[in-house]
Amino acid sequence: MTPIPAELRDLVATGPMTHLSTINPDGSPQVTVIWIGLDGENLVSGHMTRQRKLRNVERDPRVALSFDAPRVPGVFLNQYAVVRARATIEPGEAAWDLLNRLAKVYMNPDAEFPAPRGSGYVLRYAVERIGGVGPWVSASR
């Protein structure tokens, strides 16, 4: 597992919309926009239903995550991160708690996650490689 550099942790804390890429049974990519957070040394996301992305991860845990850094006016190429990881699925009520915590980042500090409390799934991403354009690239090499 590759440690997550402080610069990438800082980016994740800003609440970037994240693209999760999984592999469909036919080998084609499946991409979903998700909320992302940190839990110790792992990136994590919460999901209340067992959607295609979860079924794909059950079959093949290899995933890619990508997210843009906040735009800097006048810069030619915006910073972004691409993370290759292996995902594991953790069923339970921790998913709602995670989504409620992330709602405060992605929506507003007083927000509550709008879905009813219940069981769901936490995807935990063990980072294998970090790429993109930004300080997290040199920090991870």
What are these regions (language model features)?
Residues 1-17:
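Extreme N-terminal tail/first-helix region
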Residues 15-49, 65-68:
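Short beta-strand segments
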Residues 8, 50-53, 95-98, 102:
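Amphipathic alpha-helical interface surfaces
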Residues 46-78:
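Helix-adjacent hinge/juxtasegments
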Residues 11-12, 56-57, 102, 125:
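A generic structural signal for nonpolar/aromatic side chains embedded in well-ordered alpha-helices
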Residues 2-3, 74-141:
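Charged, gly/pro-rich active-site loop segments
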